[in-house]
């Protein structure tokens, strides 16, 4: 099914398939942080992220959220719809962590009374700056109607995912979402995994995500395996 490489990003490689409307997303073991300044590899990272994303996409689909997910080709390769990516990264924040604590007078660990939605312009060249509705519309990134729909979807996904993770022993301080257009609809794209979410253990507060690599806080491969064992235990039974 896989034909030629279309694009290689920081942690995934995208391939064309024999179907012009479908792509294969290969989750790699590559690690990057701080806009690619810090790089490494982590054993089985791609596999765990692919399996976690698969589980979450399937769960969200059952809840009525449309995604680009079509199925798995292999343990770390996902078949997805070819979408026109909207150049907005949506970050729902439930607990203060990361950049928000450096940019605003809020202490890490502060639980927000309601989710805070942050929109960033998806651009390595410009450093993914924060944008608002007006800028997105003026730049032609999305219409106001699309932005309203994305905001509504992001809040719904946040509520579903937050509840799901808490039932599996994780807090969800924040995470990143990307959306794309396909067949006249907006669908959830990219991935939802340890690379794109902050997962904190409910009991210990331990980070179980890419912050372990960013700030040299522990063994990332072991942490990703722990997350996978809770969310997709079936892959360890094979």
Swiss-Prot record:
Gene3D superfamilies: ATP-grasp fold, B domain, Phosphorylase Kinase, domain 1. Its EC number is 6.3.2.6. GO terms for molecular function: ATP binding; phosphoribosylaminoimidazolesuccinocarboxamide synthase activity. Pathway: Purine metabolism; IMP biosynthesis via de novo pathway; 5-amino-1-(5-phospho-D-ribosyl)imidazole-4-carboxamide from 5-amino-1-(5-phospho-D-ribosyl)imidazole-4-carboxylate: step 1/2. The keyword Signal does not apply. CDD domains: SAICAR_synt_PurC (cd01415). Pfam families: SAICAR_synt. It catalyses: 5-amino-1-(5-phospho-D-ribosyl)imidazole-4-carboxylate + L-aspartate + ATP = (2S)-2-[5-amino-1-(5-phospho-beta-D-ribosyl)imidazole-4-carboxamido]succinate + ADP + phosphate + 2 H(+). It comes from the Archaea. Keywords: ATP-binding, Ligase, Nucleotide-binding, Purine biosynthesis. InterPro entries: SAICAR_synt/ADE2_N, SAICAR_synt_PurC, SAICAR_synth, SAICAR_synthetase, SAICAR_synthetase_CS. One of its GO terms (biological process) is cobalamin biosynthetic process. It is an enzyme of class 6 (ligase). Transmembrane segments: none annotated. HAMAP family: SAICAR_synth. Belongs to the SAICAR synthetase family. PANTHER family: MULTIFUNCTIONAL PROTEIN ADE2, SI:DKEY-6E2.2. This is Phosphoribosylaminoimidazole-succinocarboxamide synthase. It comes from Methanococcoides burtonii (strain DSM 6242 / NBRC 107633 / OCM 468 / ACE-M). The gene is purC.
